[in-house]
Amino acid sequence: DYAVTISREAVQLANPPSGEIERQLDNLATCAQTMLSQAIKAFNDLNADLAEGTMGMSDPVEHNLNEIYDAMMGGEAGSDLKELFAIFVIFTNLKRVVDQAKNLCEETIFAVTGVQKRAKVYRILFLERDGSFLAPMAEAIGNKLMEDTGQFGSAAAEPAEIERGAVEFLASHGMAMPRTRCQSVADLTTHELASQHVVIGLDAPVDEYIEKMPFHASALSWQLRGIEGEGEARYESAYRELAVRIRDLMSLIRGDE
């Protein structure tokens, strides 16, 4: 079905893709074909090692897709909407081939070892102006509560030292802060941003921190400005609200997994 759809869209193109679009198309097509071929072989041979290695080939695909979408939005695929849509459909279906190959590898591993499909790990990034309180606390809470299904990080526009009181509060709840400052938003690489599933602004909208969001990532604004109390009470108030919101978020994005 994917091959038929790709072929149907390809014949709609007035000219073959060129430049960056052509390069990315070749890369993704090669990856999809190789993964599918190896996945089928792994399944037929009941080769769990080959299946595991093949699954790893899918890791760069999400990053490459962001480069593809950026190139398309930048005009490298032309401005004709019909052509843009056709190219988008082609890339999307190649990505689905990669996904199906990965699924087949997971079935192979289960058949050979009895190991169930690994839970998908969602990457969540919290943003705060100075990163002195809310963002590092949200990161610590997320990694404590959802360590099997979430990978949480934090960044700040103008990183300041994390409040000592916040560090002590988290320590009293069994959570250690591995650094004294958040990473700077300016230091986030394109790959780091592209790997995020959700980016959350805690004291301002995400677009005040990140001008260009990755194509597939979701931006949320929690606007936690009204944390009440002082000292321990302030940290407790933030802790309770962040814990509830993080649990609700993970429940929403994981669905029935």
Regions found by a protein language model. Give the residues of each.
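Cytosolic, long alpha-helical scaffolding segments
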Residues: 1-125
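Short, flexible, glycine/charge-rich loop motifs used to bind or transfer phosphoryl groups or to couple energy/partner
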Residues: 114-115, 143, 186-191, 208-212
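Conserved active-site segments centered on acidic
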Residues: 121-189
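Structural signal for conserved beta-strand scaffold positions within catalytic alpha/beta enzyme cores
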Residues: 126, 154, 201, 220-223
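S-adenosyl-L-methionine/SAH cofactor-binding core of RNA-modifying enzymes
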Residues: 177-199, 203-207
